[in-house]
Design a protein with these regions (language model features):
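Active-site glycine-rich loops that stabilize anionic/oxyanionic intermediates
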Residues: 21, 29-32, 94
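Conserved hydrolase catalytic core segment
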Residues: 43, 85-125
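Conserved alpha/beta-hydrolase catalytic His-Asp/Glu region
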Residues: 124-130, 142-202
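The conserved beta1-alpha1 loop
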Residues: 27-29, 211
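Serine-hydrolase catalytic-loop signature spanning alpha/beta hydrolases and amidase-signature enzymes
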Residues: 29-39, 50
Length: 227
């Protein structure tokens, strides 16, 4: 797949661009990189022009200083600008959905539609912030990979965990490159993100919600309330 790079504030940002047609941007989540979308790429590449970035600090992209949901949405906007694109549909998974919401707030004119894939427009609750702080302490003590090995199986339903153990183990092994600095920066950025539920209320473009019945990370009632 065509691999491209963007220099953003002195850091190299990697993304893939494939296909032709209307542009769809897929933004991965925490503890992932753009390869998580490979099956979607295979299915959609003959129908759309797909842009799949590695977020700063993930995959082949370098971490940028002072990372926030807003600065990562700025990176996505710069990719679109570099490719002379003025519109797209954007789908964000988990943390990628938080970035999509920041993009919708600051660059709404670029969006034909957007979607939240197991994600939310709401900020972290105090309980969630406490959980993230515990995660940060675990990362500091045991390292990034041990943390990802501990939490990643929780992203899959009990049925999937049983049926796809080999695939899940392979996916987890692919995450060994992550650094503590990157994961801690992501957690701190997610803890600081604001409530963007009003963006959904005010949006004039179609919005897609993909909700998991067995999602243990994003409360399903919060997602249903936002729909």
């Amino acid at each position: 797949m065509p691999e491209k790079f963007l220099i953003y504030n002195g850091s190299s940002i990697h993304y893939r661009m494939i296909g032709a047609g209307k542009t769809v941007v897929f933004i991965h989540g925490f503890g992932e990189d753009g390869s998580v979308w490979n099956q979607q790429v295979t299915f959609l590449k003959n129908k759309f022009q797909l842009i799949i970035p590695d977020l700063p600090g993930s995959g082949k992209s370098e971490l940028i200083p002072g990372i926030t949901m807003e600065s990562m949405s700025d990176v996505i906007k710069e990719i679109l600008t570099q490719e002379n694109l003025s519109s797209c549909t954007m789908i964000g998974h988990s943390m990628g959905g938080y970035i999509t919401m920041a993009f919708a707030e600051n660059y709404s004119g670029f969006l034909n539609a957007f979607g939240l894939f197991h994600s939310s427009s709401y900020p972290d609750s105090e309980e969630k912030k406490a959980t993230r702080r515990k995660g940060i302490e675990f990362i500091k003590q045991h390292g990034a990979f041990e943390f990802l090995k501990a939490i990643t199986p929780n992203l899959f339903s009990p049925v999937s965990t049983g049926k796809m153990k080999k695939e899940i183990d392979t996916f987890i092994e692919s995450l060994s490159y992550f650094t503590p600095q990157t994961l801690i920066a992501y957690y701190e950025a997610m803890m600081r993100r604001p409530d963007r539920s009003m963006i959904l209320d005010k949006s004039s473009v179609p919005i897609l919600f993909i909700i998991g019945q067995y999602d243990t990370v994003i409360p399903i009632n919060d997602l249903l309330k936002a729909c």
